[in-house]
Amino acid sequence: MLLASFTFAIMGGFAKILGQSLPPLEITFFRNIFGVAIILAALFKSPTKSKGGKFWLLFFRGFIGFLALLAYFYDMAHIPLGVAVTYNKTSPLFLAFFAWLFLGEKLPKSAIAALILGFIGIVLIAKPNGFSLSKYDLLGIFSGIGAALAYTSIRELRRYYDTRVITLSFMSVGTIGPLILMIVSHYININPNLDFLFAKFIMPKGIEWIYIIIVGVAATASQLLMTKAYTLTKAGIVGTITYTQILFALIIGTILGDKYPDFYTIIGMALIILAGFLVVKK
């Protein structure tokens, strides 16, 4: 699991480097098309026997997962890597809430306490001016909420579809969606506030292709290692260890030139990590 967290942070580091010259929308496209190729090969070798029947929920999982990933990649390119990863790691907190709201799962007192701690942590990191949050903070929070909604849908979808099909829905939308948006971007005037959603394709050059491959390989390796970890030990232990991603991201981000987080940001990160521990160990 530590290796999964490290490779995940490596992916984030190279995505951040690519984000200085390529739009996050394009990085999202390349990250997903790599995964689509791998999953299609796996399905060809061993066809699925899913019973299906929940197409729109499957599409929703792909669509919301794509938007969450896009928001995440955009933030990695524009704010410190450790902060972007911390926002994304709020997903277990929102997952506990959505599982209670949509699936009728119990919301124990520890989970309620975790939600409160997580909210305080978000406020300390975002430092809102009154009720106003920056675009980066809003997208960071959405990356956690969107991921949680995607995970919530998986709990229902796994009764109808092979895990590979569920993952393919996410990566397919995450490939086709950016492609459409990049084509549309050539025919519209892009509002600066929507630059995370619309961007013109920029042909990668030289070493950027190597970075793109690393992002794809690291993302796939991280997913495989995490899945393996869940089969070898208790989910609570694995879930707790995933928060080392924040530490790895802080280190890699600092190496890449990120500003070291201030006192309030560190406290906010600590509260979100503590909240995550409370949720995954409930």
What residue ranges belong to the model's regions?
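C-terminal transmembrane-helix exit sites in multi-pass transporters
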Residues: S91-A113, L247-I266
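Hydrophobic transmembrane alpha-helices of multi-pass small-molecule transport proteins
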Residues: S110-K127, Y264-K281
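Structural signature of hydrophobic alpha-helical transmembrane segments
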Residues: Q20-G35, F73-S91, L133-G146, P204-V217, ...
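Helix-helix packing/entry segments at the starts of transmembrane helices
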Residues: F30, V85-T90, Y161-V173, T220-T254
